[in-house]
Each structure stands twice: as structure tokens, then as C-alpha cells.
């Protein structure tokens, strides 16, 4: 129950609320915020940008909400379309960011183990990983000197009727129905 949070949002007159939540609590929070009559701009996580999330809420609750994404499933990029088609054929639902990140993460781990020549020496694998540059489903991933990955980030927005659009990056910006 997020009723005390909803009360605090109302009292603060917040213009935006960042919902750092997974699907189930996020859906409940959004429903309670909207049912309370608050039209605060909602900003969600990649868990809140897929058809799987839309099944948890009536589309009216999501209209205008933005979220960061690792994988906008309708982006006109061959790598995203191919993964999405294969995922749908195997699992019977739209691909989502967690699936794409998990797929790429596993491939990155395998590549690092191959480069290190071991699957059991964590230090060697970490060293190999820091030197990898990888083009995966989510895009180009490279690790910096602090072993932090720098994958691409997309910003998508829910539109009326449960469609999405891509707001960022600019070269993929699209109208409703293409996110």
C-alpha cells in the first residue's frame, strides 16, 4: 500500500515522481497515484516499459509516463527486431529489457571466460571483461577503467491506448506506436 507516499506526493506538489520499482509494486503505486487524482509526471524503470507491464494496468494509468529502457522493442534496429522476433517465437510474448540485458550479459560472460582462458579464475575473467568491447542486442557495450559497463540508454514514453514512442536518442525518436 502506497497511500502514505501518495499523501506525501500530494502535499509536496511534486511535479515528477521517479518510481524505482519492479513491475508489481510499480503497477500498484501508479494505480494509487492516478486513482488519487494526481497528474504528476511519472518516471519509471525499464521494468515499466513493456507489454508485460501493460498487462498489469489499464493503459489510462500509463499515458504520458516516461521510462528509461535498455531495449525499446519496436525500435527500427535490426538487432532489436531479430531478438524480438526470436523471443516472441520462443516465449510467446514481446521481448523486454530484462531479457535483452540477460542475453547480452551471458554472452559477455562467455566471451570474457574465453578471453581469460578460464571459467573459474574470477580475477582473470574480470581482467578480460575490462578489455572487451561488445556489440549485442542492446547495442554497443564497453567497460571503463573502473569496470563499469556503458550500455546505451533509451527513453520511451507511454501514449494513449497503451502504445509507446521513443523520445531518446534523437536518431530513433518516433511517434506513438513505434516504441
Map each language-model feature to its residues.
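Extracytosolic ligand-binding ectodomains
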Residues: 1-179
